[in-house]
Regions:
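Conserved phosphate/ATP/ADP-binding segment of small-molecule kinases
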Residues: 126-199, 208, 229-232
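Short pre-catalytic strand/loop immediately N-terminal to key active-site residues, enriched for Gly-Thr
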Residues: 20, 199-212
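Conserved N-terminal subdomain of the carbohydrate kinase-like
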Residues: 2-114, 118-126, 268
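Charged C-terminal helix
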Residues: 232-273
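Short, small-residue alpha-helix embedded
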Residues: 207-237
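General structural feature for long, well-ordered alpha-helical segments within catalytic domains
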Residues: 25, 29, 63-66, 70, ...
Length: 273
């Protein structure tokens, strides 16, 4: 078998769903990481014709069996990863597969980033059970850093939905955590505890409904980490990237309602590199 490691390029395993139309999950992670010079390898948890935000009649293909088969093949190949990131899972079984993947592939220097997709706006998504929440807590305990929104932070800690971030951060199952989408007056941003530091990053709130902001942030954050920035320094850089994408998307409303126009910012960065 020909060698597949040692190329000098950072490699990331992305465990998430693939929405073939719409800007979320793997359809944003793959191009963003690639533009940052990272070899991005996808392990799809599901394949959808579109994402589920605002579309009707979408088609879903569950990939649970393929997740196990793909992982086993990569293990036989001896693949190694500098970063493993996770997003959407459709069942407790898939969360167990992801935990097994981390145990099999995460080495001492591998960064594990978990975006614990569970809910938003104060509610657990209807497709999830309490068993999924329990399995997600266990997965977060294997991570080096997690990026829940406020709702997900409350679900992971078993807290009331009005619990403040200062209370939530030390209760989360991972010592390094970025709570995303936190509102503060006319601003929106991030409250984090990273490498023992307490960090806040805020930007002006743009009042439009957006899909996939968490996926774009997590992708940019992973890319910044793999480009040599620590957990702390990568946060404002990823926040700046997302902020630029939001402003670009606002200019394209209402036609671009289904996701972030991240391509504009990638194009600018590619030209300036």
């Amino acid at each position: 078998m020909k060698p597949v490691n040692g190329s000098g390029m950072k490699r990331a395993a992305l465990i998430n769903d693939l929405s073939c139309f719409g800007k979320c999950s793997l359809s944003v992670a793959l191009p963003i990481l690639s533009a940052y010079g990272v070899e991005a390898i996808s392990l799809p948890t599901a394949i959808l014709s579109t994402h589920t935000g605002g579309f009707e009649g979408y088609v879903v293909r569950d990939m649970t069996d393929e997740m196990r088969a793909f992982s086993a093949h990569w293990k036989r190949m001896g693949l190694k990863f500098d970063l493993i990131s996770t997003g959407f899972f459709s069942s407790p079984e898939q969360l167990e597969i992801a935990a097994d993947f981390i145990h099999d592939f995460a080495e001492e220097e591998t960064i594990v980033l978990v975006d614990p997709v569970l809910g938003d706006n104060g509610s657990l998504y209807g497709c999830f059970s309490e068993a999924c929440v329990e399995k997600m807590r266990a997965l977060c305990a294997l991570a080096d850093v997690i990026s829940p929104n406020h709702t997900e932070a409350c679900l992971l800690t078993g807290s009331a939905m009005d619990t403040g971030v200062e209370t939530l951060l030390p209760l989360l199952p991972c010592p390094n955590a970025v709570i995303t989408g936190v509102r503060r007056g006319a601003e929106i941003g991030y409250e984090a505890r990273l490498d023992g530091e307490r960090i806040s990053v805020y930007k002006a709130y743009v009042p439009i409904q957006l899909h996939g902001t968490g996926d774009v942030f997590a992708s940019a954050y992973a890319a910044e980490i793999l480009n040599g920035h620590g957990l702390v320094d990568a946060l404002p850089r990823a926040a700046e990237f997302l902020d630029a994408c939001i402003y670009d998307t606002a200019k394209r409303q209402p036609a671009h309602w289904y996701g972030l126009a991240f391509e504009d910012e990638l194009k600018r960065r590619t030209r300036n590199s």
